[in-house]
């Protein structure tokens, strides 16, 4: 589990192929949610304080999935 709180940390985590990324910054989480919704990357999203992002590589692209409860993982 890799925790990020800034956009730079998120970019680093994505480029280093971290499997599980947890965003601890609420503003950054909201920004990711809005951008992802705009570009239709979301499979499932809930407005909660802090999001776990699970990357799934498909055909060279990155899909982002937001889940509410981290305890299942």
Q: What are the language-model segments listed below?
A:
Residues 1-3:
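A short, exposed loop/beta-hairpin motif centered on an aromatic-Gly-Thr core
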Residues 39-51, 56:
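Acidic, low-complexity, intrinsically disordered interaction modules
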